[in-house]
Structure formats: structure tokens, C-alpha cells
Design a protein with these regions (language model features):
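Active-site loop/turn elements of alpha/beta-hydrolase fold enzymes
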Residues: 58, 82, 89-91
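A fold-wide structural signal in alpha/beta-hydrolase
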Residues: 52, 78-85
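N-terminal cap/lid segment of alpha/beta-hydrolase-fold proteins
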Residues: 1-47, 96
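Short beta-strand element of the alpha/beta-hydrolase
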Residues: 50-58
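Primarily recognizes the serine-hydrolase "nucleophile elbow" in alpha/beta-hydrolase
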Residues: 105-140
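Catalytic nucleophile-loop/oxyanion-hole region of alpha/beta-hydrolase
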Residues: 65-66, 72, 87-119
Length: 140
């Protein structure tokens, strides 16, 4: 893995890049409850092949398991030249339209801000994140 780029989906699409050796994993990993905003964690490769995968972690729309169902896969994908993107979506608080809105925006942002990674763009998910991945298939 080369770098990590964090993109806030609702803060004017602000982006911040990190060298992975300087990242405090405690800020990124673990289980997030009541996420107020959507964020993309983009793990770049040393030799990107133009492909990327957006990972939608599970958590039953009550929390997001960023570590076990997200960031833990980054090294494997990036070694294959696949840019790996962990998608932290907002919690719906009973409204399933909220994460669906976020995945729509995430796909748009990835295509517009990172076209070099979008020759082949896939979405996968764990648990309820699998639902979001399936929903996103209707948008690709």
C-alpha cells in the first residue's frame, strides 16, 4: 500500500492524504456508531492497474465495522494493484434511504475524483453492506 486518502462526502468533498506509516489506525479502525457523515478511505497502490473496489462494511445500519469488514482487506487488494476504498456511510436512524444516498454519492465521487482507478469499478459488502453493494449494482 502506498497512501491513504480520506474523502469527506459531506464536507465540500474535502480530501486529506496520509502516508500509511504515519496513520494512527485507532482513528480509522474499529466500530463506528452513529456516523454523522459519509467518508471514503482510499488505499492507493504502488502499481495501480486501473481497477478499484468499494467495500461497504456491515453493522446492521446501527454501526459500521470498519476494521474486520473493511480495512483488514486493504493490503490484499492493493498488492494486486487494485485501489481499495472503504466506505463509511451515515447511520440511517430508521431511514434506509440515508445509506443508499451515500452509496450513490460515493460512486459519483470516486468516478469524478479518481478516474484513473475506474477502468473497472466494483462494489462489495459484508452483511448489511452486502445490501448496499447489491443496491449499487443498479447504479453502475
Amino acid at each position: 500500500m502506498k497512501n491513504l486518502i480520506c474523502v469527506s462526502l459531506y464536507d465540500n468533498l474535502s480530501m486529506k492524504a496520509y502516508n500509511l506509516s504515519e496513520v494512527n489506525n485507532k482513528e480509522l479502525m474499529g466500530i463506528v456508531e452513529n456516523a454523522p457523515e459519509g467518508t471514503l478511505f482510499v488505499f492507493t497502490c504502488d502499481r495501480p492497474n486501473g481497477s478499484s473496489v468499494i467495500m461497504c462494511p456491515g453493522g446492521g445500519f446501527l454501526k459500521t465495522n470498519l476494521e474486520n469488514e473493511g480495512i483488514d482487506f486493504a493490503e490484499w487488494f492493493t498488492k494486486l494493484g487494485i485501489t481499495y476504498i472503504v466506505f463509511k456511510y451515515r447511520m440511517p436512524r430508521g431511514n434506509p434511504d440515508v445509506p443508499e444516498q451515500d452509496i450513490r454519492l460515493a460512486l459519483k465521487v470516486v468516478r469524478e475524483k479518481f478516474p484513473e482507478f475506474c477502468d473497472k469499478l466494483g462494489v462489495m459488502g459484508a452483511s448489511i453492506g452486502g445490501y448496499l453493494a447489491t443496491f449499487s449494482a443498479t447504479l453502475l
